[in-house]
């Protein structure tokens, strides 16, 4: 039985004051014990969040990292070892905003994925298609290719200590969301792709849905067989909304 995971990606949001308010709101939430919960603040606020949520069953992750574990001369980047030191347990890799806006290639994503695992943290591999790719019926090919880049380079066993998040790019921050059936189709295809190589890895792999997840839509999405939780964007900046999404995963 796969344990649900709900992860909040705060993206490039927050001041020390607003993050303190969000921490306080999260501390008030009754979170289901059967659901793993994580938040991904900006790197500037990681320490504040780790300290503020101490004793609360919420893991803290980083939104990105350098493609190396060790510290070194790489201005503006964060080595994975620094994230370990800061209290992070997970790291997002390959988020669509980094792929599309910042030009991160599959090769860069693979390098970051490997560095995160080498340091003992859990990578959350983001995959997804654009509106144009969906309209061209290329969704499964695009998503499958992004997943295959990691498997081909590191082996299917690399997914044993990893999470995959399917995020249809056309649904991120747009208010649009894939229907539960659309999301399930892609999640099932991801699991089937992994199962062709290792059935046990596939059965244990947690696959999250990320694309304008809201409390109102969460229960129906999470009710799908191959959807194991959510990577939540804007809604995670509201503690009550995020708490409701977490509770939906527990139901």
Curated annotation (Swiss-Prot):
Binding site for substrate: 9-11, 173, 212, 233-234
UniProt xrefs under InterPro entries: Aldolase_TIM, TIM_sf, TrioseP_Isoase_bac/euk, Triosephosphate_isomerase, Triosephosphate_isomerase_AS
GO molecular function per UniProt: triose-phosphate isomerase activity
Enzyme Commission number(s) from the entry: 5.3.1.1
Keywords, comma-separated and alphabetical: Cytoplasm, Gluconeogenesis, Glycolysis, Isomerase
Gene3D superfamilies assigned to the protein according to its UniProt record, in alphabetical order: Aldolase class I
Any GO BP annotation: glyceraldehyde-3-phosphate biosynthetic process
Pfam families associated with the record: TIM (PF00121)
Signal peptide coordinates: none
Record pathway: Carbohydrate biosynthesis; gluconeogenesis; Carbohydrate degradation; glycolysis; D-glyceraldehyde 3-phosphate from glycerone phosphate: step 1/1
GO annotations of cellular component type: cytosol
Keyword Cell membrane in record: no
Class of this enzyme: isomerase
Active site: 95 (electrophile), 167 (proton acceptor)
Subcellular location: Cytoplasm
Catalysed reaction, written as an equation: D-glyceraldehyde 3-phosphate = dihydroxyacetone phosphate
Domain of life of the source: Bacteria
Family assignment from sequence similarity: Belongs to the triosephosphate isomerase family.
Assembly description: Homodimer.
Function as written in the Swiss-Prot or TrEMBL entry: Involved in the gluconeogenesis. Catalyzes stereospecifically the conversion of dihydroxyacetone phosphate (DHAP) to D-glyceraldehyde-3-phosphate (G3P).
Protein name (database record): Triosephosphate isomerase
Organism (species): Ectopseudomonas mendocina (strain ymp) (Pseudomonas mendocina)
